[in-house]
């Protein structure tokens, strides 16, 4: 009776095949984007928000959506082509989305704007901004002509990164009557305060702002302009989660986002 010989090489190839199959399956599971906006929905909502007065420079914007696993699901821009916005803001928008998703919970929401003061030297989260680095191979992969399109090279991959100024917001929707954290939105391209305003209005248009309690004003994830100099002229946030006021003349004289674009199910 002849027993076929199985070489070590054959066993190795089989094992590698199993590993790749398993990894591929996990990637597909992580990449499920059914509960977050697609490219068309993001682009429409982002454009509507950018077209409003937001206290910045009126610049064109980048926007990125990630799912709860941190996988990029959509990247879009508001200008006529990919060069109409700051090119560097594409990756920053993805970094903001990753941050808002990574540090929000089903029962606690944090925006990137909320993190600014906490990560300063002496702050309770100092050093957070150096964790979870950006995956550069994903960030800069081409072709560049696909940037901001439905087939943007970041889509389907985890970007990583931590950003600690305005423009990143977690996304919550109702699934089977339960409030569910489904991912996050990141916006970049203007002042950090305008980025937050545009992200907030984009999330409002998408009707994904049924948020739980947060550390910002009125227990939300809104931006808090509560930084002022202490006795030694050092900037200090009264509540510990403050963000610099980029344009006091605008932000101090206009209605709060909580008034103009309240959180919760839209009427």
Model region roles, listed by residue range:
Residues 28-267:
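Flexible, solvent-exposed loop/hinge segments and secondary-structure transition points
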Residues 21-27:
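Signal peptide processing junction and immediate N-terminal pro/mature segment
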Residues 1-11:
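Bacterial N-terminal signal peptides that target proteins for export
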Residues 3, 15, 149-150:
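Short beta-strand/loop turn elements enriched in aromatics
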């Amino acid at each position: 009776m002849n027993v076929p010989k199985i070489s070590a090489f054959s066993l190795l190839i089989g094992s590698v095949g199993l590993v790749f199959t398993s990894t591929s399956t996990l990637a597909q599971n992580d990449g499920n984007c059914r509960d977050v906006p697609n490219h068309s929905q993001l682009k429409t909502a982002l454009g509507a928000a950018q077209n409003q007065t937001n206290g910045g420079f009126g610049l064109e914007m980048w926007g990125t959506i990630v799912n709860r696993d941190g996988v990029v699901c959509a990247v879009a821009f508001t200008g006529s082509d990919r060069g109409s916005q700051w090119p560097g803001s594409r990756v920053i928008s993805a970094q903001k989305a990753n941050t808002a998703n990574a540090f929000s919970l089903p029962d606690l929401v944090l925006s990137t704007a909320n993190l600014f003061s906490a990560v300063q030297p002496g702050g309770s989260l100092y050093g957070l901004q150096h964790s979870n680095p950006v995956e550069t191979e994903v960030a800069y992969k081409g072709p560049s002509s696909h940037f901001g399109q439905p087939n943007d090279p970041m889509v389907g991959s985890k970007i990583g990164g931590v950003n600690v100024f305005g423009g990143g917001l977690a996304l919550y929707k109702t699934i089977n009557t339960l409030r569910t954290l489904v991912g996050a939105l990141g916006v970049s391209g203007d002042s950090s305060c305008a980025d937050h305003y545009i992200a907030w209005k984009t999330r409002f248009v998408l009707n994904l702002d049924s948020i739980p309690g947060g550390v910002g004003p009125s227990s939300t994830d809104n931006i808090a302009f509560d930084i002022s100099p202490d006795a030694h002229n050092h900037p200090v946030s009264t509540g510990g989660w403050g963000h610099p006021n980029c344009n006091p003349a605008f932000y101090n004289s206009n209605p709060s986002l909580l008034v103009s674009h309240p959180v919760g199910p839209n009427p």
